[in-house]
Amino acid sequence: MIANAVAAVATAASQGAQVVCLQELFYGPYFCQVQDADYYSYTEQIPDGPTTQLLCEVAKQHGVVLVAPMYEEEQPGVYYNTAAVIDADGKYLGKHRKNHIPQVKGFWEKFYFRPGNLGYPVFDTAVGRIGVYICYERHFPEGWRALGLAGAQIVFNPSATSRGLSEYLWRLEQPAAAVANEYYVGTINRVGVEPLGENDFYGQSYFVDPRGQLVGEAASDTEEEVVVRDLDMGRLAEVRDLWAFYRDRRPDSYESLVKP
């Protein structure tokens, strides 16, 4: 699957893409459908592991910023669901570790991952300030806002999410987050049923602008697709001047939001 991802990056770059985000845990099946310690072997160091090093070369070759979600080993027995961010010159910029970890049928993630401990970093890249918010995290508005307060202009939501209530929410939560926080959101999903379980991943990757409008159409819900869209970064200033949500925040009244 690494070869497929590298080919997808090349395809996107050939169509003019300047930043590419891959799906959650991109280089293998979504193994969290089962609880099997054999999949601990999928971990690797970030950035010193072979996949990050390869992707640094790929990013430099194509001149694109890369967001690469992987299974990270910090030390033996300590694992995270992590996205590496690589600049267009091939320089590794840092990583986001998924903070919110689900544990329900078909998504046994607590068996594999510790909750992240790096907060909500935003990375200065060749295309602007980028944040990452992985899959299940999208249900938590606090992280979206933290990324906005840190200056994010584009937030990527790489996911592995399947049909059911989630499919309805897929068209609600990310546009709402884009509007409330006045940035672009790129949301990426797997497609189809994998041999490990019954999850039917519904694809439908898309970009949404800070007005809550889709940029072009969403991708197919049954076929893999490389989604390339043109984002007008000037729209960020237009929206923020019109809807001054950050000006009108009242953090002094939000104390209850951070109480356990």
What kind of region is each of these model predictions?
Residues E44-P47, E57, E74-Q153, R163-A176, ...:
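Active-site catalytic loop in hydrolytic enzyme cores
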Residues T82, K95-R97, N157, E217-A219, ...:
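Residue-level detector of high-confidence beta-strand sites
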